[in-house]
């Protein structure tokens, strides 16, 4: 399929009731990265670049809940002090396997032309995410990669910074994905792009917060049995009417692809 408008003159309303512009992307598809696109937590994966492929207990003991980004800043600093360079870390990121079926899913999405606008929101880091996606051949699919800024400093060592500040009590201090997605939607609205539906593919607890932006007709794709899925189930049980989006748990990315294929058939 080369586009979303096989019928001449077919136009649809966006989520806010506006008429969708011809040729504009109809659906926003948002992906998480760790344990969603890739089948590992990339912050754990880079330990393979450390001496002895492990971190000292004194460093691991500095982690505090809600301040994981600050902890990872210390991890990157330690790795740099041990002689680990960005090229060494890139080599690790490039070998992290995709989740089962993810390569096929991303190829399928890429073939849909203007149907989907695809973005990535990740609490990992830009250097790692982009390294992995380029190695897998999928970097160009994503219109925007929204992650904690990282890159070599003047000494040639990899550094990490927080994405932003926010006031959300549920999310880590460095990133609230609800805020990230909300700001992106406002930005695209200013560009004149109004999506008909939102699709969100994730796994972690921090992927639950942006679920508040999803409305009826939108779809949440939580990885089955992971924190995002459990939090959605708890919310549905506590107050069934409060969770408006359709929920499609996935075990492999083929589950996501199958549902998206059904969506396109109904367009």
Swiss-Prot record:
It comes from the Eukaryota. Its cofactor is Mg(2+). Has a 120-fold higher level of expression in bone compared with a range of soft tissues. It catalyses: phosphoethanolamine + H2O = ethanolamine + phosphate; phosphocholine + H2O = choline + phosphate. Disruption phenotype: Mice display growth plate abnormalities, spontaneous fractures, bowed long bones, osteomalacia and scoliosis in early life. Primary cultures of tibial growth plate chondrocytes and chondrocyte-derived matrix vesicles (MVs) show reduced mineralizing ability, and plasma samples show reduced levels of Alpl/Tnap and elevated plasma diphosphate (inorganic pyrophosphate; PPi) concentrations. Mice lacking both Phospho1 and Alpl/Tnap show a complete absence of skeletal mineralization, leading to perinatal lethality. Its EC number is 3.1.3.75. One of its GO terms (cellular component) is extracellular membrane-bounded organelle. InterPro entries: HAD-like_sf, HAD_hydro_PyrdxlP_Pase-like, HAD_sf, Pase_PHOSPHO-typ. GO terms for molecular function: metal ion binding; phosphocholine phosphatase activity; phosphoethanolamine phosphatase activity; pyrophosphatase activity. Substrate binds at residues 43, 123. Belongs to the HAD-like hydrolase superfamily. PHOSPHO family. This is Phosphoethanolamine/phosphocholine phosphatase. It comes from Mus musculus (Mouse). The gene is Phospho1.
